[in-house]
Regions:
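Terminal helix-turn-helix DNA-binding modules in bacterial transcription factors
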Residues: 222-261, 281
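Alpha-helical residues within the helix-turn-helix
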Residues: 207, 255-256, 267, 271
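Short hydrophobic/aromatic patch on the recognition helix
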Residues: 216, 264-265, 269
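N-terminal regulatory/effector-sensing and dimerization cores
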Residues: 23-121
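A short, Lys/Arg-enriched amphipathic alpha-helix from helix-turn-helix/homeodomain DNA-binding modules
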Residues: 133-138, 178-200, 208-209, 229-248
Length: 281
């Protein structure tokens, strides 16, 4: 039987203090905001696990509404889920802080290959699923995070730690779906997300994916995807991440997202999320 978890706020200080750690297995991000904000139609590009360490987070769409406060619970979010997100500061005015892990498709595939016989199809996360953060689950989560943070932990060890966290979630009824074979739109998403600062064109992306520009556009249309819309979506979400997890200036963030004109970047950001870049900072 699991024990309720007491106050965890003091435990959420990672050794290196790094804000963002991309990994082949999973990635760790630590958003921090001194102003609350509301973002519409925010997209989670990968299977995600969220915990709020200070302040509050409300996630909602047509399916449901979920609220996290401090470190009392976790929220599992399915890949490609779109939700409206509201982040608020703590009652005492302390900054909103959170941590979230995104799990790579290769890791989830490995998990299902090893443990798929233990999983019930009805148990998979379809949109969002919330769970109390008990002591045992927190131990698994912290162990995984320390592995991401430590340069001395090999990728193999990190994989085992991440699988251990997925098992701990599975024991509590949380299972992410097994990734399907990626279509062209998914492969393009992965390509663009790796280097959103590059001056991408459909022709250049097609060469990287070994298809002609015409074939790329035709097959994307078959999947209901526009190249320019997807590129903008990836860049805007990358901008949102950088605004919340780094101290980079707005012009630097614009450049990191492939925009040489700050005014065009600012216009795109406001159009996509409904508020200005300055509203976050």
């Amino acid at each position: 039987m699991t024990k309720p978890l007491p106050d965890l706020r003091a435990q959420w200080r990672l050794p290196s203090g790094a804000l963002l750690q991309p990994q082949d297995v999973c990635s760790l991000a630590r958003p921090q905001l001194t102003r609350g904000h509301y973002a519409r139609d925010f997209r989670f590009f990968e299977a995600t696990l969220l915990v709020v360490t200070c302040g509050a987070l409300v996630v909602e769409n047509a399916v449901g509404r979920w609220m996290l406060e401090d470190a009392g619970s976790l929220l599992a979010v399915a890949k490609n889920t779109q939700v409206n997100v509201r982040k608020t500061l703590a009652d005492d005015g302390a900054p909103y802080t959170a941590q979230f892990l995104t799990f790579a498709p290769a890791l989830l595939t490995e998990f299902h290959q090893r443990y798929g016989h233990m999983l019930a199809p009805a148990s998979t996360v379809e949109v969002c699923q919330q769970i109390s953060l008990d002591e045992g689950l927190n131990d698994s989560l912290q162990f995984c995070i320390r592995g991401i943070e430590s340069p001395d932990v090999s990728e193999l060890q990190h994989t085992h730690r991440a699988l251990g966290l997925l098992l701990a979630l599975q024991e509590r009824g949380i299972v992410y779906s097994r990734p399907s074979a990626p279509g062209l739109a998914e492969r393009l998403t992965q390509l663009l997300a790796k280097s959103p600062e590059q001056p991408w064109t459909a022709a250049l992306a097609g060469r990287e994916l070994a298809v002609s520009e015409a074939t790329l556009r035709r097959r994307l249309a078959d999947e209901g995807v526009s190249f320019s819309a997807l590129l903008t979506e990836i860049r805007m979400h990358h901008a949102m991440m950088l605004l919340q997890t780094t101290h980079l200036g707005v012009s630097q963030i614009a450049d990191a997202c492939g925009y040489r004109a700050l005014s065009r970047f600012s216009m795109r950001f406001r159009s996509r999320f409904g508020f200005s870049v300055q509203d976050i900072r």
